[in-house]
């Protein structure tokens, strides 16, 4: 069952909790998988193979105080969702 949320979703962190959360987001929250971006400072793409094949994006990056506004403005805006699992 596809979700109804039409905005973008940014998930920070590629660990175990994120690995459990991403499939739930794809199944129940977002309408299209290309709405979902996962970000971690390490390459965790093998952990998200199914989500990436479905159209989600993985970005290697790190959100810090010095780049917070710049990074977040690229991936989320008003009405979007940021999930910090880092």
Question: Where are the model-predicted features located?
Answer:
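N-terminal Rossmann-like NAD(P) cofactor-binding module of classical short-chain dehydrogenase/reductase
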Residues: 80-84
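Conserved Rossmann-fold cofactor-binding substructure of NAD(P)-dependent oxidoreductases
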Residues: 62-75
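Glycine-rich adenosine-cofactor-binding loop
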Residues: 9-23
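Conserved hydrophobic helix-helix packing surfaces used for dimerization/oligomerization
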Residues: 8-9, 36
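NAD(P)-binding Rossmann-fold cofactor-contacting core
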Residues: 30-50
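Phosphate-coordination loops involved in phosphoryl transfer and adenosine-cofactor binding
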Residues: 5-8, 78-79
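Gly/Ala-rich phosphate-binding loop of Rossmann-like dinucleotide-binding domains
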Residues: 22-30
């Amino acid at each position: 069952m596809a979700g109804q949320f039409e905005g973008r979703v940014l998930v920070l962190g590629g660990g175990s909790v994120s690995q459990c959360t991403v499939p739930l987001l794809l199944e129940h929250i977002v309408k299209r998988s290309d709405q979902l971006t996962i970000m971690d400072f390490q390459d965790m793409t093998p952990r998200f193979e199914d989500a990436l094949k479905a159209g989600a994006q993985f970005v290697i990056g790190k959100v810090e105080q010095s780049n917070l506004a710049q990074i977040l403005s690229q991936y989320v805006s008003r009405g979007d969702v940021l999930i910090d699992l880092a």
